């Protein structure tokens, strides 16, 4: 009886791997003619920039980041100061150490600016000039860090955090469409 149970577990693993391999090949065939834009706002922008520095499939054509931050350290430090009037030291150091202990990564490792620096595919940077949550001042270092591949910038005049699309709907849409269409 144990032999049969064990064989069913082994067979499951064997056939799962084969069917997974088949699924991956089918997915690759399907994606061959796909063009993908990775576009994120706020935390999504941080994720977009984090992905931008990695090797991505050929169907990923470009990136659009809207109000992303330079690094977790910079963003959390800004929030401590602006929302609570607290200095970065010692809270950031302590919290980063706890994060390292508990989750295996420190704030120093989460640097979107370093990923942007490695990025080779085109990227559009968008930020509202009245953004205080992710300070507008973070936009230009990110833009300057992008030295490989095409880049463009859109500053949404008068927009606060994550409101560039709402405040400048037509202009935002046109700029994103124009940027993305150059990758077709």
Language-model segment annotations:
Residues 99-115, 121:
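Active-site nucleophile elbow and catalytic-triad environment of alpha/beta-hydrolase enzymes
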Residues 129-134, 162-163:
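Acidic catalytic loop of the alpha/beta-hydrolase fold
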Residues 50-105:
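Hydrolase active-site cap/lid region
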Residues 159-169:
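Catalytic histidine-centered segment of alpha/beta-hydrolase-like enzymes
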Residues 1-18:
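Alpha/beta-hydrolase active-site loop
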Residues 119-120, 125-127, 131:
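Short beta-strand/loop motif that positions the catalytic acidic residue
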Residues 32-42:
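Alpha/beta-hydrolase fold nucleophile elbow
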Residues 112, 121, 135-144:
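Short alpha-helix in the alpha/beta-hydrolase fold that links the catalytic acid
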């Amino acid at each position: 009886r144990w032999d049969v149970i064990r064989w069913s577990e082994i067979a499951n693993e064997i056939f799962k791997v084969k069917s997974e391999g088949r699924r991956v090949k089918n997915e690759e065939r399907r994606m061959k003619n796909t063009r993908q834009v990775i576009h994120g706002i706020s935390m999504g922008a941080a994720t977009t920039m984090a992905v931008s520095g990695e090797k991505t499939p050929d169907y990923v054509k470009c990136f659009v980041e809207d109000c992303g931050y330079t690094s977790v350290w910079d963003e959390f430090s800004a929030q401590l100061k602006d929302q609570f009037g607290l200095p970065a030291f010692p809270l950031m150091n302590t919290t980063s150490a706890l994060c390292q202990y508990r989750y295996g990564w420190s704030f120093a490792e989460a640097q979107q600016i370093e990923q942007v620096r490695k990025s080779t595919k085109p990227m559009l940077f968008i930020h509202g000039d009245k953004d205080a949550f992710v300070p507008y001042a973070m936009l230009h270092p990110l833009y300057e860090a992008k030295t490989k591949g095409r880049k463009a910038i859109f500053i949404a005049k008068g927009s606060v955090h994550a409101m560039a699309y709402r405040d400048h709907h037509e202009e935002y849409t046109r700029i994103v469409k124009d940027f993305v269409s150059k990758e077709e």
